[in-house]
């Protein structure tokens, strides 16, 4: 496997309870496995202490960078800002609450290189610990994406995407909301990027609130899905 050059992107909105833990965990794993890495924290106009905490971590370590969105751009805008800031060969995105064990990242990199893929998208072995409502919502969303677009990815919105940065040069991303994950995978498929999947253990958040299953987020996802249907199917 070639020397590992990787950017880790953490989109964050009001994640002061997690920001230091997330950065330290990424730095620990990458410090043992990567020859060249950076950690990009996207502060999506947080109203708590996320931004100042991230800035303090960046001042202490030049490998940590912070992108401050002047207004809240939601997940799509935060990820687009983080991806635009990435400079390394590979890009990895996950959530600040670390829904996965970051020690799995080197395995994903090995699979990416061994199978000569462009993207690794992970799926959760078991997500019932989140409760029945989120479980049903995710099941329905994944099947809707499969029916409308024919995308055979088991866990479209799971926050574990590893990919070659060169993929970002092949197409623009336009979504502002949580449809960004589906858009990324669909545009990648349309441009012939090989996608592989791996199963991971899942650790639901214990602090703060997830807004992914809120009515407003779901409505925005459905709107963007409808707008992009002809282009992405």
Describe the residue ranges of each PLM region.
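A conserved acidic beta->alpha catalytic loop
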Residues: 43-52, 98
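Acidic helix N-cap motif at the loop->helix transition within catalytic regions
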Residues: 17-21, 48-57
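Cell-envelope/extracellular polymer assembly enzymes that use nucleotide-activated donors
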Residues: 5-7, 38, 183
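Acceptor/aglycone-binding surface of glycosyltransferases and processive sugar-polymer synthases
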Residues: 69-85, 90, 102-178, 204-224
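N-proximal low-complexity "stem/linker" segments adjacent to membrane-targeting elements
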Residues: 1-28
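Catalytic donor-sugar/metal-binding loop of nucleotide-sugar-dependent glycosyltransferases
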Residues: 152, 173-176, 185-203
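Conserved donor nucleotide-binding strand/loop of the catalytic core
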Residues: 37-40, 51-85
